[in-house]
């Protein structure tokens, strides 16, 4: 039986991180976690990491699509934070963003790791940005690294 698994080191990989500015006090912690993980676990140098900022979570799929279209990157890590408010806006933003990022991944055959917090409260966001519940930016970076290696193994 053949089992294909990917590790984390990918020293020659080029990674784009697309990150929304809205809720930046949370997003910057996610970004720090992602970059640290790419460097430590992926052994990726600063020269192979590009950070692209956009206004909000709804814009992430378009930015990810443009990045993927260049063909310059091996994976994209999407980061952001959407906090539920008192209107249905949260549901629309989260749904469309998630669908859009998945579509980019399939359309361009590139890993698009999901590191966007979709939470009910600011406390939940803080917990997931590097305190009690780990750092979801770091977890998304690990997912991107593993997917680069899994796809490489499948293609070889």
Swiss-Prot record:
Binding-site residues, 5-amino-6-(D-ribitylamino)uracil: 22, 57-59, 81-83, 114
Catalysis performed (reactions): (2S)-2-hydroxy-3-oxobutyl phosphate + 5-amino-6-(D-ribitylamino)uracil = 6,7-dimethyl-8-(1-D-ribityl)lumazine + phosphate + 2 H2O + H(+)
Family annotation (Pfam families): DMRL_synthase
Keyword Isomerase: no
Example GO molecular function: 6,7-dimethyl-8-ribityllumazine synthase activity
Known pathway: Cofactor biosynthesis; riboflavin biosynthesis; riboflavin from 2-hydroxy-3-oxobutyl phosphate and 5-amino-6-(D-ribitylamino)uracil: step 1/2
GO biological process: riboflavin biosynthetic process
Keyword Transferase: yes
Cellular component aspect of the GO annotation: cytoplasm; cytosol; riboflavin synthase complex
SUPFAM superfamilies, A to Z: Lumazine synthase
Regions annotated as coiled coil: none
Recorded family membership: Belongs to the DMRL synthase family.
HAMAP family to which the protein is assigned, alphabetical: Lumazine_synth (MF_00178)
Known function: Catalyzes the formation of 6,7-dimethyl-8-ribityllumazine by condensation of 5-amino-6-(D-ribitylamino)uracil with 3,4-dihydroxy-2-butanone 4-phosphate. This is the penultimate step in the biosynthesis of riboflavin.
Assembly and oligomerization: Forms an icosahedral capsid composed of 60 subunits, arranged as a dodecamer of pentamers.
Protein name: 6,7-dimethyl-8-ribityllumazine synthase
Native source organism of the sequence: Vibrio cholerae serotype O1 (strain ATCC 39315 / El Tor Inaba N16961)
